[in-house]
């Protein structure tokens, strides 16, 4: 397994792989890997000859300095996990390598509308940071396929639109959420939970499941469903942050034409922000 830290060496390797006719899969990550990431790697192996994982804690997508400072950085441990999964290349650049002229002078890639609604409304600039760095990774790696988890559902939809709008010749493969036995979605932030908080954390999934059951039964009173879910979270020690029910394809409010809904939930448990999502068929 090659560990590459510079764009110069990465481009050299990509050129060689392309000349050899290799099919390339990219799995972009911010490190601190868990079972969800490893599922992405396993799926990538099915779709390509060469699997490349990037590890980069992207400062452009953080809207709080404290979050950036506290984000776990576990490069050595991550590389051991990726080696065990037979990843071919790990691209682990520094911020200086990715933004040599500084972020304030960086050309921006931003998907309109989708980036400013739902979670984007309360985190201005977050998705712009995501799409900017992902577009840079796409240009550097030139993958045939790229894999993203469905837990960050709005991010997934934004990246799909960016790929379509900018004519990237890349197939985006969504990978279902990986959960532990309690239903809690694997997340890099789970490590930040105390022992007591880990016992409370599955309530987020349970609240989402309650909404899903109501939607399946035909209850489309979105406001009532969200109020009930938020009350459940607050009673269990959470601070509800972002809770939405919308059309899974457009991220617009549900309508009579909606065939599939998506539940998007984010809540604080102590000092840790947890997110989750679930799609629900309405037909």
From Swiss-Prot:
SUPFAM superfamilies: Nucleotidylyl transferase. It is an enzyme of class 6 (ligase). It comes from the Bacteria. GO terms for biological process: pantothenate biosynthetic process. Beta-alanine binds at residue 61. (R)-pantoate binds at residues 61, 155. The active site is at residue 37. GO terms for cellular component: cytosol. Pfam families: Pantoate_ligase. InterPro entries: Cyt_trans-like, Pantoate_ligase, Pantoate_ligase_C, Rossmann-like_a/b/a_fold. Keywords: ATP-binding, Cytoplasm, Ligase, Nucleotide-binding, Pantothenate biosynthesis. Its EC number is 6.3.2.1. Pathway: Cofactor biosynthesis; (R)-pantothenate biosynthesis; (R)-pantothenate from (R)-pantoate and beta-alanine: step 1/1. Homodimer. The reaction proceeds by a bi uni uni bi ping pong mechanism. Catalyzes the condensation of pantoate with beta-alanine in an ATP-dependent reaction via a pantoyl-adenylate intermediate. NCBIfam families: cyt_tran_rel, panC. This is Pantothenate synthetase. The lineage of its organism: Bacteria, Pseudomonadati, Pseudomonadota, Gammaproteobacteria, Enterobacterales.
């Amino acid at each position: 397994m090659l560990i590459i830290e510079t764009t110069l060496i990465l481009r050299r390797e990509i050129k060689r792989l392309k000349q050899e006719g290799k099919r390339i899969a990219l799995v972009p990550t911010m490190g601190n890997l868990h079972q969800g990431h490893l599922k992405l790697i396993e799926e990538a192996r099915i779709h390509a000859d060469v699997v490349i994982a990037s590890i980069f804690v992207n400062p452009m997508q953080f809207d709080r300095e404290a979050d950036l400072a506290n984000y776990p950085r576990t490069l050595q441990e991550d590389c051991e996990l990726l080696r065990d999964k037979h990843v071919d290349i790990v691209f682990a650049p520094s911020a200086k390598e990715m933004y040599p002229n500084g972020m304030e002078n960086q050309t921006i890639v931003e998907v309109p509308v989708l980036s400013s609604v739902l979670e984007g409304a309360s985190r201005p600039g977050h998705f712009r940071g995501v799409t900017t760095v992902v577009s840079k990774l796409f240009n550097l790696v030139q993958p045939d396929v790229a894999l993203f988890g469905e837990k960050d559902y709005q991010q997934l939809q934004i990246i799909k639109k960016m790929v379509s709008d900018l004519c990237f010749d890349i197939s985006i493969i969504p990978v279902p959420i990986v959960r532990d036995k309690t239903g809690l979605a694997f997340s890099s932030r789970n490590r930040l939970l105390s022992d007591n908080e880990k016992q409370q954390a599955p309530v987020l999934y349970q609240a989402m499941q309650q909404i899903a059951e109501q939607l399946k039964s035909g209850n489309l009173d979105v406001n009532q469903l969200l109020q009930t879910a938020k009350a459940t979270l607050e009673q269990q020690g959470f601070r509800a942050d972002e809770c939405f029910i919308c059309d899974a394809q457009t991220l617009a409010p549900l309508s009579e034409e909606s065939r599939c809904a998506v539940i998007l939930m984010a809540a604080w448990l102590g000092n840790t922000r947890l997110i989750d999502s679930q799609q629900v068929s309405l037909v």
